[in-house]
Amino acid sequence: MSNLCTDTGPEEKKYKREEIYRRDGREGFILFSKVLSAGIGGVDAYPVRVEADVSEGLPQFLMVGYLASEVKEAGDRVRTALRNAGCPLPARRITVNLAPASVRKAGSRFDLAVAAAVLASMQKIPAESLGGLMIAGELSLSGQVLGIPGVLALAEAARAAGVKRCIVPSVNAREGALIQEVEVVGVSDLTELIELLRHPEKGVRTSVSPDSLLGRSEGNEAEDFSQIHGQKMVRRAAEVAAAGMHNFLMIGPPGSGKTMIARRIPGILPPLKLEESLKITKIYSVAGLLPPGEALITKRPFRAPHHTTTAEALAGGGRLPIPGEISLSSGGILFLDELPEFRRSALEILRQPLEEHRVCISRTAGTYVFPADFMLVAAMNPCACGYYPDRSRCTCAPRETARYLGRLSQPLLDRIDICMQAPRLSYGELQGEGENESSASIRRRVEEAHRIQKERFRGAPARFNSRMSVRDTERFCCLGQREKQLLKEAFDRFSLSARAYHRLLRVARTIADLEQEDRVREGHILEALGYRPYERSEWLREV
């Protein structure tokens, strides 16, 4: 794609009207100038050409180009900010166009680019200084440059468009500088912008070393698996789930440690690689949730929305959609506590992201795609009061328990690979006799399992055992005659569906990886059968 800022063909010459204007004896304005900025769609940025034209006519500031209301308001912000910076607008007709006009633009990120284009038309800065630039930022009425979301995505768009330099708010400069191929310069007010465009050589490039930021990442020592007493089977199930990025459901009474285990799962996942960290940072930046002063997110996300969360908050939404909890948990954990208490609409919206690992939101202006590469961890009580099947404590009638369990649909349960009962702890388990295994020790095994899967799926779409296609499952889960016979007996005894059969094989493959076995053995299958999620009919039959 040609660079809109550096084209010098016949079309460019047609717009250079300063010679015609000077022949009339009224020097002072170039009339037309342009600069690149960027809009946000989904989690990616796209180039927007900001054009400014000054002409004779009634004094007004007109903005066109399929604009949201906050973009149209940029005219008033720019006019006032320029006046307060000592550059009042002339009493002429000023038209600003944001192209392409077929795409709706929203947000206040275009203010700084509009101001730069207008300044060039007024000859306050050299028009050629805007060539090869991408500019974005919000203006206050005093001329201060305010921070904006999505600067990392903007820098990526600049790199893709061949732009070598970006001017962004100072508070966002370190974030944009993560893209090493683009020179990112921060400005704090309009005066700095004018000085920089008059003397480009004075711009100070913002320097950030992403690797050093990752190197400073530290685990959360306050949440370690060594603090969890008892629940050895649930802890083992959590390790298997983390090793293959399998969706994981824990069922047990209140106080059995389900939430404690869930919050410690990020600590046994491998540290983020730079590519993963950049993807997560871009999502949080677009959502406006990047922590102040942080250029790069170095820890895996752990999102735990309340059960009153709506479907829109989970998936993302708005007239111009922004990422929801599902996308914000990409690369990490989405923890849904009290799973049956969530609205049915919120639970059902999980089905597509769990299957396709993306969220698609359709609006009149287009379809927005957000990443959903997360591991679902959920916890629930076995009944409304929480103590079923302990009839000495459970106060629920059988019909109430059946209704409570029936809130989860079978299609949703089909997408959960591992289900584990978390029983009430005994006094001896609570006392914690002996030393429990630490998160660091478990993480070493999980990292080795991830390494094995990386080698296995090199060049393939899948990255983890949980994401294997049916063909890959049959290819990589090699079975001997005894293993095949065991699977046949399990298939007949439990009336497994085809989906449940392949899910069982994927979990068995992960267990084999943890033990560094090339083939899936009988013991791996038996352990995977112990993690088999209940069919909804089985739950209701037990009541």
Predicted segment positions?
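Peripheral, non-AAA+ core regions of ATP-driven protein-machinery
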Residues: S2-L249, S256-T259, I297, S362, ...
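Basic, amphipathic alpha-helical bundle interface domains used for macromolecular binding and assembly
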Residues: L67-G75, P90, N97-G107, L320-P321, ...
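Alpha-helical scaffold elements adjacent to nucleotide-binding pockets in ATP/GTP-utilizing enzyme cores
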Residues: R77, A81, V114, A153-A157, ...
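Inter-Walker segment of RecA-like/P-loop motor cores
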Residues: A295-A313
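Walker B catalytic acidic pair
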Residues: D337-E338
